Structure formats: C-alpha cells, structure tokens
Amino acid sequence: MDTMITTPLILILITCGANSQTVKPDTASESDQPTWSNPLFTYPEGCTLDKLSKVNASQLRCPRIFDDENRGLIAYPTSIRSLSVGNDLGEIHTQGNHIHKVLYRTICSTGFFGGQTIEKALVEMKLSTKEAGAYDTTTAAALYFPAPRCQWYTDNVQNDLIFYYTTQKSVLRDPYTRDFLDSDFIGGKCTKSPCQTHWSNVVWMGDAGIPACDSSQEIKAHLFVDKISNRVVKATSYGHHPWGLHRACMIEFCGKQWIRTDLGDLISVEYNSGAEILSFPKCEDKTMGMRGNLDDFAYLDDLVKASESREECLEAHAEIISTNSVTPYLLSKFRSPHPGINDVYAMHKGSIYHGMCMTVAVDEVSKDRTTYRAHRATSFTKWERPFGDEWEGFHGLHGNNTTIIPDLEKYVAQYKTSMMEPMSIKSVPHPSILAFYNETDLSGISIRKLDSFDLQSLHWSFWPTISALGGIPLVLLLAVAACCCWSGRPPTPSAPQSIPMYHLANRS
C-alpha cells in the first residue's frame, strides 16, 4: 500500500569527536512509522478534546511539503557526500566499452541462366565474458560484409566474417558495493568486469571506477536530535529534502559502524569529547547500495503530488476565509500526508478545533469504514471522535452508521454530499468569557487589555460616583461663601433716570 520514495545513495560524514556516554534514542512511538511514504490515509491517535483549541479560519495552516522546522532539536554540523546534490556526476561514472561479437554474412543464390540474388545478414554470435578479452577488437567504422561467393545453379551460398568490435559505454558505479549499475546488465547490476548483458553477443568491459567509501565530494549539512528523547530525527542540507531517520539502524561497512537511514543512506559520526553517542538497533538485513535510476523520477512524482495537494489546500483555505464557512471536504485538505506529530483539525457546532497530535499511517480501512488498521498493527481500531458523539471526527471524517472519509469518498462515483454541507464559523471568544458565560450568551461581551488608555478611561468612569458623593456639600459651601461676600459690600447709589434740559441751559 505504501509507496516508498527513494533517492540516490549518499554518504554523510559528521564531524563531532570521541569519549562519551551512550544514549539510546527513544524510537517506540515514531520509529515504526514510514517517514517518506504516502499512505492511503493518516489519522490522529490519542488526540482528546483537552488537546484541542478553537481557532479562527485565518489560523488554519496547510501541511508543509516537508517538515523543515527544527524546534526542540539539537543540530549536529555535518559534511555530506551526496550523489543527488552535486551537479557533477562524472565522478560516479565508470568509462567502459561494449564488446560485440557479430557475424557478417553475404548470401548468394545463382540460377540456371546465371541470374544472381545477393543478401546480407548480421548474426549474433554468443560471447562469453572469458572470451571477450581474448581477441583483438576493431572499431565499428572498419566493419564490412565479405564479397559474395557464388556457384552456378546453387542457392544460399554463404560467405562469413566474424568481427569483435567495441562501442563506448559508461555506467554508474556504486560507491559502497562497487557494483556496476546499468539497465543493460542482467538484473541491472554486475559485480565484476567483464559483465554479461541482456544480449548474448555483447559483453561490457570497464575500468575499476571510483573506490569504495570515497568521500571526495562533500557539502555542508546538519543532523537533528530531539532534546528530550535523544532521538535522531533527520538530516538536512540546503536545497535538498530532509533524509528521514525514524527507522535508522546500525550497519557495518568499510570496517566501521554506520547509521543507515530510512532510504538506505549511510551516516558516519565522529564525536567530540563529551558528546552523547547515539545508539541504534542493528539492521536486520545487510542491504546497501544505490537505488535504480528510476527512483529519482519516483521522488519527483511524489514531490509533484505533494505540491498539488498543498495548492488544493491553499485554495480550500481561501474559500473558507472568504465564505466564513467550512465543509468536511474542505477541512480534509489540511490533513498531513505523512505520519508523525502534525497539525490536526476538526469541526464541531460552528467552531474549528486545532491541536498538535500524533498521526499514524492507515494501512487498511474496513469495508463499512467504521474501523481501520494502523501501520504494523494487527487489529482494527475505531476512529477517534473527540467530541463524545458518533458523528464528527478529524479532517472531515463524519457519519453515524456509515463513516464518510472525504479523502476516500472523492474517488467514489456516487459520493455522499454530506461532505459538501457548509458549517458557518463562529468567532473564537476570549477564554475568560467562557469561564462565566455559556456560548449562547456571548453577544455584546468583549475583553480589552488594561493599558494606559484604559486606566484613564477607568478614572473617568468613576467621576460620576465621586460627583455624587461630594457634589452636594461643595455646592452648599459655595453658596455660603457667596452670601458672606455679598453682605459686606457698601450700598451703591442709584443713578438718575434722566437729566432735565433746563439744567444745561442755566450753566450757559
């Protein structure tokens, strides 16, 4: 069910030192999970309601194509020799030649009256690896058909010449096993030159190629270890996808111990004084070597699918924000395709819930879709539903008697339209409000921060109370003072109402 994604072989050399204690990584929970597989489905386990929080639509986040965050991890500087990162692949190619053994045949048929028919044919001649180096060879430019040998009134008179000639052919050389790798070889590889090919008349011969364990091409990288569990998580290099180490094991090669990654790559660690020594279980098999040439295309295919899934998720996020509603189908786009600790989402009664929980790869779903079997599990388990009912689960999973899984339902011709039913999203209230009010009584309630502006507002909000308590005595005091001031002032004579005209006349 799982599609393993592989990349060309790398050699990772970590410079860190010697003398220290041994720490066994905790691999009980995540080491059994396929790191770079794309399972049919992933689902949270042990993700209870107390691990979830309500979030707004803007807080949703699409899963990353690769988990490139290193929070809570210790980084070990490393040097990596990678066949996939370097631009120059000339060092891993071995120059050689195809040795051909071909019979050049001219056929002549002569009639009674002297008429002739000339035919030419190439015949494969079986060539063994031992014979390939025993004869002198020529070049393809020097090949020719022999002159016809004709006899009167005789058909099919043959004249043959056998040639050994070479054509240039370079092949890959596995730097670990030193095997020659090419699709021309039987089984795709050859241990020692000369090598038999799929054609009975062609043998490949080449030089020794690159030496085993060669580390001439190196790049800078890091190895990451979890601070709490001391579990080696991954190795990364700029511009390259992370190499998973969840299922890493120890293997002996070139006279020393190596860490073999999930994809079969090898890591050699040299510890500094006082550094913690990382310990892994021994590999059950001794398999080492480069994967086939098609693996690069398989990885690119997985990368394209992951990019398409992320684009679909971003479009779903935009629709959720613009409509302020969510459907089980849209929420399913936020499911991480890889097992491990991931963001998980659920929808319930107008709210979207988010948590960071362990998700497992689902290898098999029962026919009625009510149970599933996790990766490497032997029994089936019911889907966890965090809200205590039998309807809503994680990432759009819903249904009572029939469980609807949008990621699987989309492949059904007559799909259930319940995964398209929208749910309006309520705004997330302040947690302090929820401590005193029910969700139905939240209208008109707000929480503000207590800053300088609010302190000033608080002061003025108490002014009516202060006025009520001290205003009346103050008014009485002002009235008494006014009366006292008025009584001690001398009287002012009243002015005449008019001036008679004759008074003015007498003064003249």
UniProtKB/Swiss-Prot annotation:
N-terminal signal peptide: 1-20
Record field: transmembrane: 462-482
BP-aspect Gene Ontology terms: symbiont entry into host cell; virion attachment to host cell
Keywords assigned: Glycoprotein, Host-virus interaction, Membrane, Signal, Transmembrane, Transmembrane helix, Viral attachment to host cell, Viral envelope protein, Virion, Virus entry into host cell
Compartmental location: Virion membrane
A Pfam family assignment: Rhabdo_glycop_FD
Domain of life: Viruses
GO cellular component entries: membrane; viral envelope; virion membrane
SUPFAM superfamilies linked: Viral glycoprotein ectodomain-like
Membrane topology: Single-pass type I membrane protein
Glycosylation sites: N56, N400, N401, N438
Segments in the Intravirion topological domain: 483-508
InterPro entries found in the cross-reference section: Rhabdo_glycop_CD, Rhabdo_glycop_FD, Spike_prot
Topological domains annotated Virion surface: 21-461
Major localization class: virion
Family note: Belongs to the novirhabdovirus glycoprotein family.
Self-association state and partner proteins as the record states: Homotrimer.
Task performed by this protein: Binds to specific receptor at cellular surface, bringing about the attachment of the virus particle to the cell. Plays a major role in the determination of host range restriction and virulence. Class I viral fusion protein. Responsible for penetration of the viral nucleocapsid into the cell cytoplasm by mediating the fusion of the membrane of the endocytosed virus particle with the endosomal membrane. Low pH in endosomes induce an irreversible conformational change in G, releasing a fusion hydrophobic peptide.
Name of the protein: Glycoprotein
Record organism: Infectious hematopoietic necrosis virus (strain Round Butte)
